[in-house]
Amino acid sequence: MASAKRVSDEPAYVLHSYDWSESSLILEVFTRHRGRVALAAKGVKRPTSNFRPVLLPLQPLSLSYSLGGEGNAEIHTLKGAEWVGGHVMPQGDALMSGLYLNELLMRLLARDDPYAALFDIYAGVVRVLAGQHGDAIEPVLRTFELLLLRELGHLPALNEESATLAPLAEGRRYALVAEGGLRPALQGERAVLGAAQWQAIESALQARQAFNATLHVVAQPEQALALKPQLRALLQYHCGSPMLRTRQLMMDLQSL
């Protein structure tokens, strides 16, 4: 809910924070109605601050803030924050997965560009991660990646060849690549899917309940395994350099 100079009771999640002064932080938050927003959280680092235990990542919040800031119209001023409740903080691999999603949103979302449907999908994914559903984490991540790319206009149609717009040939396999879109697989190429599989994903993405429909399709182990490197490469292409920190950290941990 918003007035001319204030936004009240806005559903939000903290994506990232960094120091602003000895006692204050700048928060990058994902809000339902206003997209990614930067907020100055004054005094939040003080031990007596009521905001300090509330402003955590991967927790559903209700925020109030005044529009504009001191010398920077892009930075607004936090006035109130409440934990909405509903689930605990994800742990272990689920926590790392959640921080990975946050980094994607930080890299790919412009400020003050609303994505209400994407916000709702993100909130649902965070609830799954908080539930520690180990086997569900990978297909849930692939589903979010697909919907994020489609929402931002970075995912081509998956029922036709991107270069020719020709329908996918039955029985043929295809690869999704950053600069060429969906193309016929090369000989020996492993991270690929068949035409019917790509068509099923496209149909799911266009369904009314796109998240549930897409999750049902990519929950098959073969689908999730083949999609992972293709989607990660496409996301990294649009995120630019350097490599996503969360991905690098996960790679480092796996090598220990």
Swiss-Prot record:
Which superkingdom?
A: Bacteria
Ordered alphabetically, the record's keywords are: DNA damage, DNA recombination, DNA repair
Name the Pfam families on file.
Answer: RecO_C, RecO_N
GO biological process annotations for this chain's record? Answer: DNA recombination; double-strand break repair
Q: Per the record, what is one GO cellular component?
A: bacterial nucleoid
Question: Which PANTHER family would you find in this protein's record?
Answer: DNA REPAIR PROTEIN RECO
- What does the protein in this record do? Involved in DNA repair and RecF pathway recombination.
The family this protein is said to belong to: Belongs to the RecO family.
Please state what the protein is called.
DNA repair protein RecO
Source organism per entry reads: Delftia acidovorans (strain DSM 14801 / SPH-1)
| Gene encoding the protein | recO
